[in-house]
């Protein structure tokens, strides 16, 4: 959401007012349809198992690729996702997966940070429409570099907090 606030002045179109009720509905809707169920599987089941086998970073990238495939059917129906350039969405999936995987690893395996980050990601994409990014590609493009920096910061944070590079074959 901080990225959204930083990029808001660069939005191509004017803002749209949003009510507190609309925000509450969006939070509930987004929580139930995405982060709760998905993160129970992605982090609750896969991340820990894969972390032990291939390292947290490789596990996060693999989960990011699976996450992308999981969302591909949304491009075959009339949905907001169908308007997003697939390479942009793929980059977001991979970067978010690294950030979420880092939070999961630093937290000692709690899925709560994963759920909260995933929820925030979904809400930022939804709120970007109200902030003037009517074309989802504008938001996905504008937020790509800040996300890359956050992902690199997350990798560094895991390394400095745990000593884990996250890539099994690089471990000495």
Annotated model-derived regions:
Residues 29-39, 97-98, 148-161:
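Hydrophobic cores of alpha-helical transmembrane segments in multi-pass inner/ER membrane proteins
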Residues 37-64, 78, 102-110:
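Membrane-interface helix/loop boundary segments of multi-pass membrane proteins
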